[in-house]
């Protein structure tokens, strides 16, 4: 939803050695123009709960394994359906600044749409529509805050009946959210209070 975006083709890569985390490279995608959601069913007894995972990457790339599939592996191992959202991170500053408290209005549109789709098709995926939450890391944590405070009205034109469903998360877990402060002139080591 939300109009046509024209930028370069989607790409993927591995981090260079200096960008390793815990001694390992991480897989990232960039220039994402078409959002996708991948549903991972629980590996053990289904609790009915579902969690949408928003990987981080500064609204420029998405850390698909470190802050995505690895999280889904854990969630599904404890009976939770995991939905990995590959939200739009198109190349260009126009898409990394905008209203609605997010650096990327396209990402918020994708988050709103995903929650509506999950509620609309909850029976198909064996999800309790009142137990759908979100978790995100860094920019994804920022997206958690954005969807948690921008759920009353869609920021795109309705596509189908899924957009009549609530896009309000039942619980939200922002992990080291980025982009939360408007004024970066304050040094992080100082306590402003």
Indicate residue ranges for each PLM-predicted region.
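Catalytic nucleophile-loop/oxyanion-hole region of alpha/beta-hydrolase
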Residues: 63-64, 70, 87-128
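Primarily recognizes the serine-hydrolase "nucleophile elbow" in alpha/beta-hydrolase
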Residues: 106-192
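Serine-hydrolase catalytic-loop signature spanning alpha/beta hydrolases and amidase-signature enzymes
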Residues: 58-61, 82
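Active-site loop/turn elements of alpha/beta-hydrolase fold enzymes
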Residues: 80, 87-89, 177
């Amino acid at each position: 939803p939300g109009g046509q975006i024209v930028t370069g083709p989607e790409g993927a890569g591995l981090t260079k050695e200096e960008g390793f985390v815990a001694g390992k490279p991480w897989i990232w995608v960039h220039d994402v123009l078409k959002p996708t959601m991948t549903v991972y069913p629980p590996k053990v007894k289904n609790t009915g709960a579902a969690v949408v995972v928003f990987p981080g990457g500064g609204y420029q790339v998405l850390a698909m394994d470190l802050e995505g599939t690895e999280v889904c592996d854990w969630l599904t191992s404890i009976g939770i359906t995991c939905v990995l959202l590959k939200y739009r991170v198109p190349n260009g500053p126009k898409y990394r600044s905008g209203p609605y408290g997010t650096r990327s209005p396209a990402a918020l549109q994708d988050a709103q749409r995903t929650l509506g789709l999950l509620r609309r098709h909850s029976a198909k995926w064996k999800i309790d529509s009142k137990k759908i939450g979100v978790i995100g890391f860094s920019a994804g944590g920022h997206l958690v805050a954005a969807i948690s405070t921008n759920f009353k009205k869609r920021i795109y034109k309705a596509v189908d009946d899924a957009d009549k469903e609530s896009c309000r998360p039942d619980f939200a877990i922002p992990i080291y959210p980025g982009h939360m402060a408007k004024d970066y002139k304050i040094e992080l080591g100082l306590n402003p209070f």
